[in-house]
Amino acid sequence: MDIAIHHPWIRRPFFPFHSPSRLFDQFFGEHLLESDLFSTATSLSPFYLRPPSFLRAPSWIDTGLSEMRMEKDRFSVNLDVKHFSPEELKVKVLGDVVEVHGKHEERQDEHGFISREFHRKYRIPADVDPLTITSSLSSDGVLTVNGPRKQASGPERTIPITREEKPAVTAAPKK
């Protein structure tokens, strides 16, 4: 019995599953584009190379922003939570971690019914006191979690170097 073995780098243009990894090219949690599900006429060509997924604009540019910053005087986290009301959000500190949780029950939007839930955890830097963490929600739906960084204890000073006449390392006694 003869079995045809195809080289994995050679794609047959009319084989419908010539690119099964296309769905795995996306970033986890990113939305699917129509081109991810259906082949275009150009993608059926054996010479077509799909552009890398990093060239696609991530969806958090318009929704789902999550950004952590370490500035000179403070630690801050900005999180887009515009789909949640303040009552549907919870921010808590557990040891050296800030945990943000949001959940809303099913409700109608322009596409149908939707329910959402998320959990985010951010490690608090060592120079931020967990008791000083605060949070606020802006009018455009961005949750900000802040904490001031501890300042160095005292001003910088130069320590003079003194010279000693005796050696720091002496010879070990011989046996």
UniProtKB/Swiss-Prot annotation:
Q: How does it assemble?
A: Heteromer composed of three CRYAA and one CRYAB subunits. Aggregates with homologous proteins, including the small heat shock protein HSPB1, to form large heteromeric complexes. Inter-subunit bridging via zinc ions enhances stability, which is crucial as there is no protein turn over in the lens. Interacts with HSPBAP1 and TTN/titin. Interacts with TMEM109; in the cellular response to DNA damage. Interacts with DES; binds rapidly during early stages of DES filament assembly and a reduced binding seen in the later stages.
Q: Which is an annotated Pfam family here?
A: Crystallin
Question: Which protein is depicted?
Answer: Alpha-crystallin B chain
Q: Which PROSITE patterns match?
A: SHSP
Keywords in alphabetical order: Acetylation, Chaperone, Cytoplasm, Eye lens protein, Glycoprotein, Lysosome, Metal-binding, Methylation, Nucleus, Phosphoprotein, Secreted, Zinc
PANTHER family noted in UniProt: ALPHA-CRYSTALLIN B CHAIN, HEAT SHOCK PROTEIN HSP-12.2-RELATED
Residue ranges of domain sHSP in the record: 56-164
Query: What does the entry list as the binding residues for Zn(2+) 2?
Result: H104, E106
| Post-translational modification N6-acetyllysine, affected residues | K92, K166
What GO molecular functions are on record for this protein? amyloid-beta binding; metal ion binding; protein homodimerization activity; protein-containing complex binding; structural constituent of eye lens; unfolded protein binding
Highest rank taxon of the organism:
Eukaryota
Where Zn(2+) 1 is bound, by residue?
H83, H111, H119
According to the record, the residues making up region (Disordered) are 145-175
Question: Where on the chain is Phosphoserine found, per UniProt?
Answer: S19, S45, S59
Q: Where in the cell is it found?
A: Cytoplasm; Nucleus; Secreted; Lysosome
Q: Name one GO cellular component term.
A: lysosome
Predominant location: cytoplasm
User: What organism, scientifically named, is this protein from?
Assistant: Mesocricetus auratus
Tissue-level expression: Lens as well as other tissues.
* Protein family per UniProt: Belongs to the small heat shock protein (HSP20) family.
Question: What glycosylation sites does the entry record?
Answer: T170
Q: List-wise, which residues carry N-acetylmethionine?
A: M1
Note the InterPro entries from the entry: A-crystallin/Hsp20_dom, ACD_alphaB-crystallin, Alpha-crystallin/HSP_16, Alpha-crystallin/sHSP_animal, Alpha-crystallin_N, HSP20-like_chaperone
